[in-house]
Design a protein with these regions (language model features):
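Short glycine-rich hinge loops at helix-strand junctions in the catalytic core
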Residues: 82
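Short, flexible hinge/linker loops that cap or flank conserved catalytic cores
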Residues: 54-58, 79, 138-139, 188
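Hydrophobic/small residue at the entry helix of a nucleotide-binding pocket
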Residues: 70
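Phosphate-binding beta-alpha-beta segment of Rossmann-like dinucleotide-binding domains, i.e.
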Residues: 1-61
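Adenosine-phosphate binding glycine-rich loop
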Residues: 191-215, 224
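Hydrophobic Val/Ile/Leu positions in short beta-strands of Rossmann-like dinucleotide-binding domains
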Residues: 62-64, 87
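Gly/Ala-rich phosphate-binding loop of Rossmann-like dinucleotide-binding domains
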Residues: 75, 79, 164-165
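Rossmann-like adenosine-cofactor binding region
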Residues: 90-187
Length: 226
């Protein structure tokens, strides 16, 4: 659940351009000669750092690559934002399962081309290798977003940086990387339209174990009480 929450947080953050907003805010950017004035309910300085584009999640198509336990939890949470949630995976869900989760299936390439944000939720193994490279980023909708809370080695980081620098992608939210900790000379650190977190999406093992034991205790109690 914690990873799903983190993924949704990053999805919200990239749509709202929180990374760029904070950078400009801390740098003291004020457009159109704005000066600080006491605010009231009706008088305030709207978007004084001059964000060119920021949006909400309502009505956006979010494409989930992989729909296991975490991907399903992400889909459930995105329903609260009234998103159009599409998914792709090797074995398609049944129609009933899709209706329960509120998702629709798309082939991989079609999902990339039609989503406003693509969120990666596949497992990594050596056989899988890179799932998101130059071809895949090139297929993505212009000015869309990319989020990865799965594994860093699923992504060609050079291709991602190129897609961000060319502004084909509007932004990315990343919690995982090819090398961890992230190398200090990584271009991702100097790409302004990224939000980076230090592989912290999952809750600590002790907290997770306590939660799982609590859930197990509830199930046992429910079973005993009939």
């Amino acid at each position: 659940i914690s990873v799903a929450e983190h993924a949704v947080m990053l999805i919200c953050a990239v749509f709202k351009r929180l990374g760029i907003a904070e950078q400009r805010f801390r740098a003291g950017v004020m457009i159109d000669g704005a000066t600080p004035e006491l605010t009231t309910q009706e008088s305030y300085a709207y978007n004084w750092v001059g964000l060119e584009r920021f949006e909400g999640l309502y009505g956006q198509t979010i494409g989930l690559v992989g729909l296991g336990k975490i991907g399903s939890e992400v889909a459930t949470r995105l329903r609260a934002f009234e998103c159009d949630v599409a998914y792709t995976k090797r074995n398609r869900l049944s129609e009933d399962e899709e209706q329960t989760l509120g998702v629709r299936y798309l082939p991989f390439d079609e999902l990339l081309a039609s989503s406003h944000c693509v969120s990666l939720h596949n497992r990594f193994d050596e056989a899988t290798g890179i799932m998101m490279g130059a071809r895949e980023f090139g297929l993505m909708r212009p000015r869309s977003f990319f989020v990865n809370t799965a594994r860093g080695r699923l992504v060609d980081e050079e291709a991602l940086v190129a897609a961000l620098e060319s502004e084909h992608l509007a932004g990315a939210g990343l919690d995982v990387f090819q090398y961890e900790p992230l190398q200090t000379d990584s271009p991702l650190l100097h790409t302004p339209n990224t939000i980076l977190t230090p592989h912290s999406a999952g809750i600590p093992i002790g907290v997770s174990l306590a939660w799982e034991l609590g859930q197990a205790g509830k199930k046992i109690s429910n079973a005993l009480s009939g």
